[in-house]
């Protein structure tokens, strides 16, 4: 695997896919990002096993296909620390990923891409498509009553229900006796 990309084209997608990764992952591979180069595109994937985020970056310079995983935080910090407009050259050599930009050189340990959890194997029972503005409006109208740090973890989310052509978002309201 080998690719070159401009810092600005890589930084925002890196930040987005690093979002789901917690500070102390339960498995070492969950602290890594999956990098895949194929068909002129770099795909970056991060997961915490509950949520997966994928970002894609178009590669305009010559590249070689391949896949690996790298420590997310280290890779992001390296890219963020480089000057604006810097070109970042990345090359996989054995179990190390070499990152070069200008006179800077970094070597990151990798884990095999085959070990990265694949949430694509999960099959949904229901699929639906709706405009982003409609989805945003539904969430905003419901999220005010969502718990954020309740020990009853099932209250820390939103329920999406479908019935026929109807999508319903709901939250559970628990009445607790006052003393």
List where the protein language model places each region.
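Structural preference for solvent-exposed beta-strand-turn elements
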Residues: 1-175
